[in-house]
A protein has these predicted regions:
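Contiguous, often N-terminal, cationic amphipathic patches that form binding interfaces
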Residues: 1-52, 56, 70-76, 80-101
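The alpha-helix within a helix-turn-helix
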Residues: 59
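Short acidic capping loops at alpha-helix termini that bridge into adjacent secondary structure
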Residues: 66-68
Length: 101
């Protein structure tokens, strides 16, 4: 699962590819060799709406606050890297389970 990388203590980098203006919002199935996690969003990529929808989707899935997740690259691209910080220890496999459930 190359789309999720441990950056440091309780900090992960999540690589996603977004498809905007979709009928459904969600995380698409993935394989262990995927470099990107594919996510569909309902919003159009206008006035940062899709980025906000992406942040809200991820933070609800893994139950974190808004200040614990940031887009660090790809603000205006479909390929994005997000930095996720946790207050407590969480394993990589636990994080993936939360994202997929």
């Amino acid at each position: 699962m190359d789309f999720l990388e441990i950056k440091g203590n309780n900090t992960y980098l999540l690589r996603v590819k977004v498809k905007t203006n979709s009928i459904k919002q969600g995380i698409l199935p993935y394989s262990d060799t995927d470099s990107w996690l594919s996510i569909t969003l309902k919003s159009k990529p206008v006035k940062n709406k899709a980025n906000k929808e992406l942040i809200n989707l991820i933070k609800k899935k893994i139950n974190i606050a808004s200040d614990q997740i940031h887009i660090i690259s790809g603000m205006k691209k479909t390929s994005k890297t997000l930095e996720i910080k946790f207050n407590n220890n969480i394993g990589k496999s636990d994080l993936i389970k939360k994202l997929i459930d």
